[in-house]
Each structure stands twice: as structure tokens, then as C-alpha cells.
């Protein structure tokens, strides 16, 4: 987020050496102390009011602290118009997205990017999430496929697979004849659950039941491995498995197996 290029930034009385402040800013970002980092950005801006890097860093710090309203307030401040040449469309759109205004978030991205195909990977990821929330699943699917063609093997691959699986399940529910579930290893209970939803939408009850049962097992195993003594984690697991069991009961009912009540009550 920050760099050491802050040396000799232009201030009201001429060039100002801010290299020491930027070195400290990097350290604060590495330990994720965004509160102190934000205050340090303010100090830099006090001596170099036109330092766009410091302003950008400050916006990111506020975003990391979930101060979304404050970010939007800063971006709308007439006193900050001098930074309008800096692309802060991602930060602005993300704030609107987190404040549950997906339509406004998409408007910001469209206004800035012009062509979605020329966007950065971060902008594309955010656009896909926004489109999903707006239930524009076909466009969302196209973006995820485009992203995954160019980013296979990175740290977010499994998360994208899970999201794409959810998109495919919704497309199947909407009756999209061109939709197919993405081929992949089902190495997480979230992907299995989404594949089960895909099968439910297609009326493939047996396949849905199999995936839901395996998803519940994987969910329990994952929770046991990671959070043996965490009561809150146990509550989260109960909520997750509860959702899975409700879907399983529905699938069994559609199969007319007669076991749906037992599944929910166990």
C-alpha cells in the first residue's frame, strides 16, 4: 500500500522529506496497525497536503478498519478534489458494496473503467461480487471464468471456485440451458453444498442428497480440526450444518424417502 517514494514531496513551503514517515508507514501496514497508520498518513498530509500517496494510503487504512462511511465522506470532500487524478474507484465502489448499495457500487465501477474487459483483477473480482448480489448471474459467471483463466493457482482460487459454484447453482435454478457446473475437485464443503444446490435446481435428488451428506461431514470435520475449544466456532458450525440439513430434508422429501423429519431432528 505504501512505498518509500515519499522522499521530497512538495509541501506549502517547498520540498519536504517524508522518507522516514513512509518507512514507518510500511512497518505499521505489515503489522496491520491501520489505526496508527491512518494517523501517520494525516501527519504526512499536514506537511505535504498534496501527497496523493498518503491520501490513498489513508483511504485504504479506513477501509481496512471498516470505516466505509468515512471513506465516502473523504472522497466527497471538496477539499480533496486535488486527488481526483488518483484512481480510487475500487475503494469507493467497495464501500458502497459493503454498505449494501450494490447498484451504486456498480455505477462507480462503470463510470471509472469504461470497459469491464480492461479492468484490473481487483476491480473484476469486486464487479463479480456486485453482480452476484444484484442477481445478474450470467454476467457474474462470465467474469469469474475470465478471472480464473488468468489466475489459476493463486491463494484465492478455491474461494473463486466456491463463488462460481454458487453462481452455477443459481443459473440452474433460473433455467439457464447453457449453464453447467464447473469441473473441479470438491475439496471444500462449500463447493459440495453449492453443487448440491445445482443438483436440487436440476431435480437430481439422489446426487443432491449425496453431496449434502458429504458436505455436512466435511463441515463437521473442518470445524473439529480448526476450533476444538472455540464455542463460537461450534455455534457457527451448528448454523452451517443446520442449513445443509434443511436442504437435505427437502431433497429427501422430493425423493419421497420418508426420512426427511429424522434428518432435521438428528
Map each language-model feature to its residues:
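Helix-start (N-cap) detector for alpha-helical repeat units in TPR-like alpha-solenoids
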Residues: 18, 52-53, 86-87, 120-121, ...
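Short coil turns that delineate tetratricopeptide repeat
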Residues: 49, 83, 117-118, 152-155, ...
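TPR-adjacent "capping" and linker segments in tetratricopeptide-repeat scaffold/adaptor proteins
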Residues: 2-20, 43-48, 116, 179-188, ...
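Alpha-helical repeat scaffolds
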Residues: 40-42, 68-80, 102-113, 139-147, ...
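Structural motif corresponding to the intra-repeat A-B loop/turn of tetratricopeptide repeats
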Residues: 31, 65, 99, 134, ...
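Alpha-helical segment of the N-proximal tetratricopeptide repeat
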Residues: 17-43, 57, 191-202
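"A position-specific structural signal for the A-helix of alpha-solenoid helical repeats
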Residues: 23, 57, 91, 122-133, ...
Amino acid at each position: 500500500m505504501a512505498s518509500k517514494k515519499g522522499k521530497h514531496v512538495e509541501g506549502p513551503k517547498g520540498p519536504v522529506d517524508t522518507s522516514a514517515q513512509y518507512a514507518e508507514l510500511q512497518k505499521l501496514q505489515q503489522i496491520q496497525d491501520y489505526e496508527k497508520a491512518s494517523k501517520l498518513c494525516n501527519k504526512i498530509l499536514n506537511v505535504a497536503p498534496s501527497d496523493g500517496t498518503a491520501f490513498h494510503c489513508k483511504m485504504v487504512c479506513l477501509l481496512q478498519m471498516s470505516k466505509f462511511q468515512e471513506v465516502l465522506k473523504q472522497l466527497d470532500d471538496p477539499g480533496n478534489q486535488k486527488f481526483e487524478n488518483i484512481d480510487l474507484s475500487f475503494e469507493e465502489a467497495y464501500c458502497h458494496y459493503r454498505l449494501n448499495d450494490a447498484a451504486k457500487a456498480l455505477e462507480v465501477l462503470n463510470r471509472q473503467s469504461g470497459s469491464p474487459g480492461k479492468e484490473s483483477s481487483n476491480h473484476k473480482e469486486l464487479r463479480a461480487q456486485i453482480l452476484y448480489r444484484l442477481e445478474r448471474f450470467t454476467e457474474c459467471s462470465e467474469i469469474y471464468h475470465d478471472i480464473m483463466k488468468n489466475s489459476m493457482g493463486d491463494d484465492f482460487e478455491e474461494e473463486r471456485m466456491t463463488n462460481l459454484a454458487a453462481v452455477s447453482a443459481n443459473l440452474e435454478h433460473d433455467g439457464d440451458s447453457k449453464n453447467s457446473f464447473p469441473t473441479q475437485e470438491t475439496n471444500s464443503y462449500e463447493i459440495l453444498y453449492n453443487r448440491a444446490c445445482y443438483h436440487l435446481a436440476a431435480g437430481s435428488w439422489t446426487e443432491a442428497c449425496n453431496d449434502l451428506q458429504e458436505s455436512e461431514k466435511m463441515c463437521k470435520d473442518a470445524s473439529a480440526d480448526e476450533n476444538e475449544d472455540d464455542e463460537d466456532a461450534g455455534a457457527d458450525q451448528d448454523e452451517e450444518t443446520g442449513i445443509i440439513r434443511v436442504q437435505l430434508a427437502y431433497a429427501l422429501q422430493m425423493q419421497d424417502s420418508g426420512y426427511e423429519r429424522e434428518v432435521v431432528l438428528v
